[in-house]
Amino acid sequence: MSEAGTGVLGLLGGTFDPLHVAHLRLGLEAREALGLGELCFIPAGTPPLRALPQCAAAHRLAMVERALAGMPGFSVDPGEVLAAAGTSAPSYTVATLERQRRQHGPQRPLLLLLGADAFARLESWHRWRELFALAHIGVATRPGHEIKVGAGDTALDAEFNARRGSAADLAGAPAGRIVPFAITAL
């Protein structure tokens, strides 16, 4: 496994309202399946495509910090929560990835983790095509939640077909691949 700070950095964002065992399981399985050097949880500030979280951002951040305390190779990035404090402006993934890229440099491989359901809606995300220049995308599948793109003629189908790779591809470039991986159903 890669050393923290140099290997592939996994990024798992979400409202975490509340954080639950499926989030933690996804992180653990992604780290193992994809050989991630580190996995960073990123609590959302103000999600643009979901209802506002019931729990305050500071509480959601504290939940994630507490859950990950003492777990080697796992970290928490408070950036979205801090940026959203005192504003209702949406927290866009592309802005978070731009910040991560500045923080970790142009060469460190970054991997944004998504579930198959979120990936299927990627075209609705703000500046979605720019995500590929900033990070790889790992798409978690489980029974009943497989990837439903690639066979059609949408822009996302074309991106999926052109960028599909494997875990072995992640360390070879800082961004640009789409890597499906299976997780167990809970």
What are these regions (language model features)?
Residues M1-L186:
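Nucleotidyltransferase catalytic core that binds NTPs
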